[in-house]
Design a protein with these regions (language model features):
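Short histidine-centered beta-strand/loop micro-motifs
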Residues: 23-26, 35-36, 44-50, 67, ...
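Intrinsic-disorder/low-complexity, polar/charged segments enriched in Ser/Thr/Lys/Arg/Asp/Glu/Gln
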Residues: 20, 31-33, 43, 62, ...
Length: 117
């Protein structure tokens, strides 16, 4: 078991011109902590985690966050904490001019992943 308790999020960001890359910062049985770097014009497609909650802490940038399967949205920005309860559909589109950077915490780590569609 790792004893590291402090992580620099910037060390895990992986900008990509294709699609955003999910970089695992830390993973235990209880949680998976991931770093996201979403370039302007990129998106994370609408999805859900059938067995767990997904919480995002927005570090920089802005995005259009999908709140449900009906397509309702809300603007998210640096400083926001965004929670998708168990089974809730969510996704994000970076409509801004700078990268959308956030840390995501999925609990439990094995929460499943289902794309909407």
């Amino acid at each position: 078991m790792s004893t590291q308790r402090v992580f620099a999020l910037a060390d895990y960001l992986q900008p990509s011109d294709q699609e955003p890359v999910r970089s695992v910062v830390s993973r235990t049985q209880d949680t998976a902590i991931v770093a996201w770097h979403v370039k302007p014009g990129q998106h994370l497609p609408a999805h859900s985690h059938p067995s767990g909650q997904d919480t995002w802490v927005i570090m920089s940038g802005t995005g259009i966050y999908q709140l449900d399967k009906e397509g309702n949205t809300k603007i998210i920005k640096a400083g926001d904490v965004v929670i998708a309860p168990t089974g809730a559909v969510h996704g994000v589109y970076n409509h801004g001019t700078e990268p959308l950077v956030f840390a995501g915490v999925v609990a439990p780590a094995e929460s499943g992943f289902e794309l909407l569609g």
